Amino acid sequence: MAQPRIGQKVVVDVPATTANLGPGFDCLGAALDLNNRFAMRRIEGGGERFELIIEGSEGSHLRGGPENLVYRAAQRVWKAAGLEPVALEARVRLAVPPARGLGSSATAIVAGLMGANALVGEPLSKEKLLELAIDIEGHPDNVVPSLLGGLCMTAKAASQRWRVVRCEWTPSVKAVVAIPSIRLSTSEARRAMPKAIPVSDAVVNLGALTLLLQGLRTGNGDLISDGMHDRLHEPYRWRLIKGGDQVKQAAMEAGAWGCAISGAGPSVLALCEEDKGPAVSRAMVKAWEAAGVASRAPVLNLQTSGSHWQPAEDE
């Protein structure tokens, strides 16, 4: 195992994720077929140098430097492998917009881990990368499906080990994700939540989660509809999203089975059958337009392959 050569390069593709899906707060997440691409290469310089090049206007506020999430994740790999850090450059084709509740930070973490690991010959297993990703992010619901793909339920067992269960999502269920021009940070969304919740609310969520998972497995719209209800976080977060209630109502009236805040928001997730997707998308965009917010609402599939890397020609 050796340090990467100057100019050695890998390309990492990492999917967007939608977390919580209503009742699965901080434990349920799904990968979507919308990818960020990170071209990472070693450059001249010491271990505190990281250069970031963003393709796309959404990332104009993002900066390089040693505190960048991509580089922080890369440093964790090198430390675990017993290697000294090196200078890196990352050129990012940004399709997953930051601060929209689609796991943008998770894509940065996973790319940094996977890219750095690939550059030094993959000394760390995927299980170790998963452990590092959760530790950096602080919660598993985005980084786990971002790395592994699919619909993932993640929980910390009594042994303190993270356990991941891959859940079924029938292909007939489509995800319409309405992505607004406004932003909402995860920290702000978390501050809106209470420190404690009633036991009755927790019980409702447990039941709803069971219904939702069975609905996603079978494609039963009634179960999805009954399952996409939450009492732990959404009652406190919808008020932070301008026009969010109207967008949700418009999606339901257009034929969606259920609606939820995607991650911490402000994007809104609607689940529906395939032939309803275009109508649900149009209705959500129109509702946000009426609230004075520009948006787009792609109809997306579950991404099942997770993140992957490939070598690229040295520069």
From Swiss-Prot:
It is found in: Cytoplasm. GO terms for cellular component: cytoplasm. Keywords: Amino-acid biosynthesis, ATP-binding, Cytoplasm, Kinase, Nucleotide-binding, Threonine biosynthesis, Transferase. The keyword Repeat does not apply. Its EC number is 2.7.1.39. GO terms for biological process: threonine biosynthetic process. GO terms for molecular function: ATP binding; homoserine kinase activity. Coiled coil: none annotated. It catalyses: L-homoserine + ATP = O-phospho-L-homoserine + ADP + H(+). ATP binds at P97, P98, A99, R100, G101, L102, G103, S104, S105, A106, T107. Pathway: Amino-acid biosynthesis; L-threonine biosynthesis; L-threonine from L-aspartate: step 4/5. The keyword Glycoprotein does not apply. Catalyzes the ATP-dependent phosphorylation of L-homoserine to L-homoserine phosphate. Belongs to the GHMP kinase family. Homoserine kinase subfamily. NCBIfam families: PRK01212.1-4 (NF002288), thrB (TIGR00191). This is Homoserine kinase.
